[in-house]
Amino acid sequence: VAETTAVPPPRLMKVTNWPMWVIGFTLLIDGMDQYIVRGSSDQIKHAFHVGDTAIGVLFSAFILVNGIVTLPAGYLADRWNRTKAMAVVIVLWSIISAMGGIVPTSAFGLLLVIRASLGFGQAVTDPSGSSVIADFYGTERRGKAFSIQQCLSYVGLGMGLAIGGAIGPLFHGDGWRLAFFVSIVPGLIVAYMCWKLPEPSRGTADRAHVSQSDEMEIASGESPPLFPHGFRKFLGDMVDGLRKDVRTILNIPTMRYALVGVSVVGFVVTAVATWMPNFYQDQLHQSQQAATGTFGALAILGGIPGTIIGGWIADRWVQKFMGARVVIPSVCIAVSATLFMFSFIPMPFGPVFVLQLLGFMSATACVPALRAGLSDAAPAHLRGAGFGAFNLASVVFGSAAAPIVTSAIAEQFGNNYRTAFLIIMPVAFVGTAFLLLARTHIEKDAAKVFEAVVMAMAAQQSEEAAYAAELAARSNNGGSANPSVQSLDEPVEPKGDT
């Protein structure tokens, strides 16, 4: 008869809002670091004697590396200690970012390599952080959790633009060097917070949702070593595992349609976010500081309330019908694209800002619902790979080309970003159509996830019952000849999280 190995019950904790804030701070630091370059781009162009296209390549290199690395990073996020991994990566990217401040002005290629390498950082923190949030918070709280995460991302974006725009012109135009050092100290602080954050067991929020519990399981033990049989064997296993994970993800209809929709929308959003300050400077005749300040204010004043409202709506409406997770983003993106297109019609700055503020608010309202919807549709053990695929689609097939394509179109019309935006913006409606197609599948896909959770909980209860029975037998008999039953005087070695 096959012998069953008993396992101790998991360690439990009540979940507060703190984990969602810590994960959000990682996006704040990342957004600040990215947009410091955007804020001081005029000084960087002057120092290295390059044009808008070269700056577009600088942005695209980061995005492209991010997209390429994010899928294997998502694969690893499903297998390693995510909170510790984020802490280590944030320390490294803070140091690498500062290296950009000492690059000689004759070596634009070196600056390009440094900025591109930072794409590795977000490629790790995004799928890992999103996976952690999905394991800390159940369906009814995920919208709020992802809204906090995204709000802090917009705060970082605004801070980066403001810092870059303010520091860049200092020291006779060499202030851009100092801007690269700004993120070191806050980066180290956030890394420490991630290191101290408990690692939740995978799928614990889903199990708590099914059992109507307010306690979450904390992963016991350390992650298994990544290279127990050598690096070559690890690479082979990772490639095979990625193929299986991607095949599983693409077999989920909700994920298929959502990934296409996200890539299309990501292209438009990145195009606007990268070059909007140039639109203010060239078409509305603002100074560099005013242009970066305007866009930073737009991101914060529109992004934060939009994201909070979107998260609240996502959590409220998902209780009525699961399809709300993809319907809400579709409607929000369509409204946003329409408002932005009207804002590009020649008119005074005041109406332009109001239209874009409402458009930004509508666009950001879609993010919590969309991320929560992907969490609902993807199995817990594949959420890292799922968010990796989400980033891969939005980055490689969408965002990476946006800065270069937009600047190239603008140059064809005499550096007219108004015309470039009017050409690009209608593409967003194609993305909304694909997101709407996901509506008919998300309820079935989410139901399959919870069905698997119920089966896993039944298996876990059997293991815990066996563990309790063995302890009782050991106590009654005063000893055991069964070597699989551990002495009560010895610590029980917990199983690693899988």
Where are these regions (language model features)?
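Central cavity-lining transmembrane alpha-helices of secondary-active solute carriers
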Residues: 60-75, 297-310
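C-terminal ends and interior cores of transmembrane alpha-helices
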Residues: 91-105, 333-347
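Extracytoplasmic gate region of multi-pass secondary transporters
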Residues: 37-38, 247-308, 363-367, 371, ...
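Helix-loop-helix hairpin linking two adjacent transmembrane segments in secondary transporters
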Residues: 149-202
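Juxtamembrane intracellular "pre-TM" segments in multi-pass secondary transporters
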Residues: 3-13, 201-259, 283, 457-465
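A membrane-interface helix-boundary motif in multi-pass transporters
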Residues: 169-184, 287, 324-327, 408-428
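Cytoplasmic helix-loop-helix junction between adjacent transmembrane helices
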Residues: 114-155
